[in-house]
């Protein structure tokens, strides 16, 4: 991946940690425990090693875009026009740790010196409702490109970039495994918006009439891909599944409640089949091919610890 003429500059975790400079750690261990996902053991040391430098880099990009915006306003003799949000996209496989990365970055950027308003959405809310997927016989393709209402997602991002106030985004429940039709999250003029999901770096196929259509990533000012060996992601997925059987799946309202009633051996066989026929296939066909489109790649090793960082050269 990182050949001689690669567009990326690669840093070991130790090298990357030096770029935090004197950036203070503003999160406590209890706050990090609250932010991380069930199966992600990220701790204070990992935040100091990786995420402080990343937050500092992102803040540099935000500040540079703000300076460019001000210079352009001077050039155009325009005043009192609000800068549109800086949008960060975060992609990667199921179970690789995208959500933890997104939440930690949100909190670190919120506490930056500029008192930025930082919002976070996931693209799960832009999945078609289960009723629609069932009607189209696509329930086993959840997370694949054709399971998302891309038109709705593009409309949402267009409104954000246009500076529209109080833009609503749909919410998704991991309990019912469905879009919450009667609940929305309101995004109102954030300084930074983080968009997290498996599909955010994917490109669209041209429609039959050959019209040019935008990609989700066209709206991003910076993009991150969370990466790891496929076998390791599979292991994390299965470990998460086993933990969820003992926690969230115990809820009778959970879509996956039936798995909690099975023996561990039976449930694990089902999880392995889901990984092989759905998540692995989606990773290989639709997610991994988008890795090279990211501005920065976080490459994880054992225990979800980042081993090296690849940053696209300017």
Curated annotation (Swiss-Prot):
Residue ranges of coiled coil: none
Protein origin, superkingdom: Bacteria
Keyword vocabulary terms for this entry: ATP-binding, Coenzyme A biosynthesis, Cytoplasm, Kinase, Nucleotide-binding, Transferase
Entry GO terms, CC: cytoplasm
Record: residues binding ATP: 92-99
Family matches, as CDD domains: PanK
Signal peptide: none
Protein name: Pantothenate kinase
Source organism (scientific name): Bartonella bacilliformis (strain ATCC 35685 / KC583 / Herrer 020/F12,63)
Gene name linked to the record: coaA
